[in-house]
Regions:
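Conserved HGGG/HGGXW glycine-rich cap/lid loop of the alpha/beta-hydrolase fold
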Residues: 2-60, 67
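Structural signature of beta-strand start/N-cap positions in the alpha/beta core
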Residues: 20, 46, 82-84, 105-108
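A conserved amphipathic alpha-helix that caps or lines the catalytic cleft of carbohydrate-
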Residues: 38, 78, 98-99
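Short glycine-enriched, charge-decorated loop/helix-capping segments at active-site entrances
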Residues: 60-65, 125-127
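Conserved acidic catalytic loop of the alpha/beta-hydrolase fold
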Residues: 68-83
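Short beta-strand immediately N-terminal to the catalytic nucleophile in serine-hydrolase-like folds
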Residues: 85-87, 112
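Gly/Ala-rich beta-loop-alpha elbow adjacent to hydrolase catalytic centers
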Residues: 87, 91, 95
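Flexible "cap/lid" loop of the alpha/beta hydrolase fold
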Residues: 96-138
Length: 139
């Protein structure tokens, strides 16, 4: 696959012979936020953490951050290898989309604090949105 997007920074740790785990950070974060988790896992797994486009050490990107581009970046990081994808927050959405679009590359998915707004049980509004609505529009 040819990747024509921005340069994506990634770092790998652990024995290359071990199963691969890729850590995908959330919005308003970067791969450094996954460093402690990476260090806990890299004794038993090959761990990749990367900065999503526009974050950390990856090429600055003005947006929009569409899901197809985020998944293409993850596929670039995988480089044809099959992995368990661990996603935090928006990174969980990237992990789920990658699993749906590239099941041959995804051995499993673990997500936490991931917004699932398309699910019928997801709250229609957040406390912040409700507070803004209650306060009215600024003049």
């Amino acid at each position: 696959m040819t990747h024509t997007g921005p340069a994506i920074w990634a770092e790998e740790a652990g024995d290359a012979a071990h199963p691969l785990v890729v850590l995908v950070h959330g919005a308003m974060d970067r791969s450094a936020g996954m460093l402690r988790l990476s260090r806990r896992l890299d004794h038993e797994y090959r761990v990749v953490r990367y900065d999503r486009r526009g974050y950390g050490r990856s090429t600055p990107h003005g947006g929009p951050f569409d899901m197809a581009a985020q998944v293409a970046d993850l596929v670039q990081v995988l480089a044809g290898r099959r992995a368990v994808i661990v996603g935090h927050s928006y990174g969980g959405n990237v992990a789920l989309a990658a699993a749906q679009l590239h099941p041959h590359l995804v051995a499993g998915v673990a997500i936490y604090e991931t917004p699932l707004s398309w699910e019928p049980w997801w709250p229609g509004t957040t406390a912040g949105a409700s507070a803004i609505k209650a306060a009215g529009r600024p003049h």
